[in-house]
Amino acid sequence: MTMQFLIASNVLLWLALIGCAVLMLGLLRQVGLLHERSSPMGAMITDHGPDVGDAAPTFDLPDHSGAMVRIGGPSALKRPTLLMFTAPTCPVCDKLFPLIKSIARAEKFSVVMISDGQPDEHQRFLAKHELGDIRYVVSAEVGMAFQVGKIPYGVLLDPEGVIRAKGLTNTREHLESLLEADKSGFASIQQFMTSRKHSHDAKAA
């Protein structure tokens, strides 16, 4: 009887331990999802790489059709350029693609998508999406030069090739914040709020 009780108690303890392990894994997954969703404020967060106000690194690279693309430097079309760092297997990038096209048309920007990955992955992406005037470049070197750590990531260049805004662009709001950061003249929301505070204090005085 005592032996049966010990066996039963050990079984229950093991079941409880397994249950705790499953619960812990579930909690860790939820924490990861929460971190993923709460991270980006888009272009209103500054990070590593060339700073806003710096001249962008320049590259001459072939696009998906073999035509050469100049990244950085003065724009031949005399208009801003939006560099979008993506990957063909990135689901967020895939969902964001129609928004990139619509914002590019509305704002009259040139758009260069800079991607990395396997050739067959790029072929599937290009077969699925109509690029229009968007140039598609495969290059890990460009991402390294801008020190892009997460995607989708946007960098806005003015017509002279100077970086005016940059940041993660997980949603339409993030893309819009990229444009607002450029229009407001601030690299981050922190700078914008500090400027507003100083302006308010000056008026109060």
From Swiss-Prot:
One Gene Ontology term from the biological process aspect of the record: methylamine metabolic process
One Gene Ontology MF term: antioxidant activity
Main function: May be specifically involved in the processing, transport, and/or maturation of the MADH beta-subunit.
Membrane topology label: Single-pass membrane protein
Stated name of the protein: Methylamine utilization protein MauD
Gene Ontology cellular component list: membrane
Entry's localization field: Membrane
Cited CDD domains: mauD
Organism encoding this protein: Methylorubrum extorquens (strain ATCC 14718 / DSM 1338 / JCM 2805 / NCIMB 9133 / AM1)
The entry's keywords: Membrane, Transmembrane, Transmembrane helix
Keyword Membrane: yes
